[in-house]
Amino acid sequence: MPGMEYSTVSKIYGPLMIVQGVKGVAYGEVVEIETESGEKRKGQVLEAREDMAIVQVFEGTRDLDIKTTRVRFTGETLKVPVSMDMLGRIFNGIGKPIDGGPEIIPEDRRDVHGAPLNPVARAYPRDFIQTGISAIDGMNTLVRGQKLPIFSGSGLPHNMLAAQIARQAKVLGEEEQFAVVFAAMGITYEEANFFKKSFEETGAIERAVLFLNLADDPAIERIITPRMALTVAEYLAFDYDMQVLVILTDMTNYAEALREISAAREEVPGRRGYPGYMYTDLATIYERAGRVRGKKGSITQMPILTMPDDDITHPIPDLTGYITEGQIVLSRELHRKGIYPPIDVLPSLSRLMKDGIGKGRTREDHPQLSQQLYAAYAEGRSLRDLVAVVGEEALSETDRKYLKFADRFEREFVAQRYDEDRSIFETLDLGWELLAELPESELKRVRKEYILKYHPKYRKRGE
C-alpha cells in the first residue's frame, strides 16, 4: 500500500531487490530505500505479483543489507521536476545537478514516461533544420519533428559530430526559440569532460540541457536518462513552443543496460541475449519525437549508436532502423582517409528529406541537385572498384572525371572543419562547384533552367 514501509527484503542481486509480504504495489511505482546508516536511495517497481515486488535500485545495490534495509512504496510514478531554469544546466542520469549550481525549483513535475500521443493529433514533420554540416543538410536533410539516428562504430568521431550538431543546429527564417536537450549514457569521464567543455566554451550551454550518465554509474540509470531528457524536451516544446533537438548518445549502452537488467530478472533472452521486448522499449523512446497539431513546438531526435563490429544487421541498429526515419552512417574507410565527419552518403538516408527542402524551405534546386550529387558520387565509387581490376588506363575521359569528382566530393563536400558551420546556401553552391567537374551532358537529373541559373559557368557570366 502507498506509504507503507517494509523491512522484508529477501534477496538482492545485481541492481535488483526482492521485497516480500507487500500489498497494493503497482508496476512502475517509485520506491524509497533507506540503509542502516540513513542513506536514501530511489528505485522503481519492475514486477509485482501476489505479495512480492521486484525493485530496481537506481543508485545500485552496493552496501545494502537485506536485514537492515527498509523500503517504502510511495504510490507515485517516477517524475522529473521541470523548469525553464534547466536551460544552461548539467545534470546526472537521474536529474540531479552536477554543475555546482543550485537545485532546480520546479514549475511542475512530469512523469518520465510522458503522455502517449494520439496518432491523429500528430502533425506531419516538415521544415528544414540546418546543422551546418553539408553531408547532412545537402544530402540527408534533417526535418523538424523527425527521428534520424546516426549509425557509428567504435573509435569513430561520433562524439565530435554530436557536439558539433548540438552547437550549430538552428531553424532558418523564423524567430523560433531553439533548444538542445543532450543525453549521454554510459560515457567515460573523458567523454563527459569533452561534452561539458564543448558546450561551455562555445556558449551552446545557454540554450541546452545536459544529462550525463557515466560508465561507472549504475546501469539502471541508463534506462531512465533518455526518458528524463525527453520529458524535459516535451515540456520545452509543448509548454513553451520551442523547437527542441534531442541528441541521445550512445543508445548501444542503453540497450546493453536493458540486456543486463533482463538477465538479472532471468527473462528468456531474444536475439543475441537482448530481451524480446527491446523493439517495443526502443519505440517508447523514439516515438516521443514529433509535432502536435495546434502546438508550435516540436521535438526532433538524433539518437547515436555504435554498431558492434560495424554490423548494421546487429539487433540494435536493425530495430532502430524499423522505428526511425532513415539513418546517417559513419564510414571507417572515410575516417582512415582523414575525412571528418566521415559520413558515407550512399547508405545514409533521410526518409522525410523531400518534405523539408525545395522552394520556400531551402532552395528550389536542392532536391534535384542532391539527386545528381548522389548519382555522380555513386558512379565515381563504382569506377574505383573497376580501376582496381582493369587499371585507370582502360577508363574513358568521362570516367576519369567521375573519379576526380568522387575524390573532390569526399575532400571538399563531405569533409569540413569541426568548427565550420556552413549555411545551406554555401552547401548547395559547393555542390554546383563540384558538378562543374563533369560534362554538362552528364547532368541528367537537374532541369536545364537550374543549370543555367546555378552552374558556375553561367553564374559567373551573369555576374
UniProtKB/Swiss-Prot annotation:
Chain coiled-coil ranges: none
Keyword Nucleotidyltransferase: no
PROSITE patterns the record matches: ATPASE_ALPHA_BETA
InterPro entries: ATP-synt_VA_C (IPR055190), ATPase_a/bsu_AS (IPR020003), ATPase_A1-cplx_bsu (IPR005724), ATPase_F1/V1/A1_a/bsu_N (IPR004100), ATPase_F1/V1/A1_a/bsu_N_sf (IPR036121), ATPase_F1/V1/A1_a/bsu_nucl-bd (IPR000194), P-loop_NTPase (IPR027417), V-ATPase_su_B/beta (IPR022879)
Membrane topology: Peripheral membrane protein
Entry keyword NADP: no
GO biological process: proton motive force-driven plasma membrane ATP synthesis
GO molecular function: ATP binding; proton-transporting ATP synthase activity, rotational mechanism
SUPFAM superfamilies for this protein: C-terminal domain of alpha and beta subunits of F1 ATP synthase, N-terminal domain of alpha and beta subunits of F1 ATP synthase, P-loop containing nucleoside triphosphate hydrolases
GO cellular component, one term: proton-transporting two-sector ATPase complex, catalytic domain
Pfam families on file: ATP-synt_ab, ATP-synt_ab_N, ATP-synt_VA_C
Keywords: ATP synthesis, Cell membrane, Hydrogen ion transport, Ion transport, Membrane, Transport
Subcellular location: Cell membrane
Functional description taken from the UniProt entry: Component of the A-type ATP synthase that produces ATP from ADP in the presence of a proton gradient across the membrane. The B chain is a regulatory subunit.
Quaternary structure, from the entry: Has multiple subunits with at least A(3), B(3), C, D, E, F, H, I and proteolipid K(x).
Similarity remark: Belongs to the ATPase alpha/beta chains family.
Protein name as catalogued: A-type ATP synthase subunit B
Organism of this sequence: Thermococcus sp. (strain KI)
Taxonomic lineage from the root: Archaea, Methanobacteriati, Methanobacteriota, Thermococci, Thermococcales
Protein's gene: atpB
